[in-house]
Amino acid sequence: MELAVIGKSEFVTGFRLAGVRKVYETADIAATESVVKSVLEDKSVGILVMHNDDIGNLPEMLRKNLNESVQPTVVALGGSGSGSNLRDKIKQAVGVDLWK
């Protein structure tokens, strides 16, 4: 299983320097959407890393697919909505809102 990273240049550069081979630099939402669809079909990708803001800009149906995806597991980093996203992921995994 491999790690894949999708995003703007400033987001993916560190992953590229760290040796991640599947790094997809995208300039706009249309390119991001296209790359996300192809990575979701790639059976060699085990973890997909994206910026939280980029995920938020995707169409609702594709966001739903990412949130429900088991393989690859989608990890959202950065952005203003990270805390609530983490809360939702924990709630989905455990079945209980642990922050209440």
Curated annotation (Swiss-Prot):
Disulfide bonds, paired cysteine numbers: none
* Biological process according to GO: proton motive force-driven plasma membrane ATP synthesis
One GO cellular component term noted in the UniProt record for this chain: plasma membrane
Q: Does the keyword Protein transport apply?
A: no
Q: Which domain of life is it from?
A: Archaea
Read off the InterPro entries from this record.
Answer: ATPase_V1-cplx_f_g_su (IPR008218), ATPase_V1-cplx_fsu_bac/arc (IPR022944), ATPase_V1_fsu_sf (IPR036906)
**Which keywords has UniProt assigned to this entry?**
ATP synthesis, Cell membrane, Hydrogen ion transport, Ion transport, Membrane, Transport
Q: Answer whether the UniProt record assigns the keyword Membrane to this protein.
A: yes
Pfam families per UniProt: ATP-synt_F
Major location, coarse class?
A: membrane
User: One MF term from GO for this chain?
Assistant: proton-transporting ATPase activity, rotational mechanism
Location(s) in or outside the cell: Cell membrane
The membrane topology of this protein is: Peripheral membrane protein
* Record function comment: Component of the A-type ATP synthase that produces ATP from ADP in the presence of a proton gradient across the membrane.
Indicate the quaternary assembly. Answer: Has multiple subunits with at least A(3), B(3), C, D, E, F, H, I and proteolipid K(x).
**Similarity-based family:** Belongs to the V-ATPase F subunit family.
Q: What is this protein called?
A: A-type ATP synthase subunit F
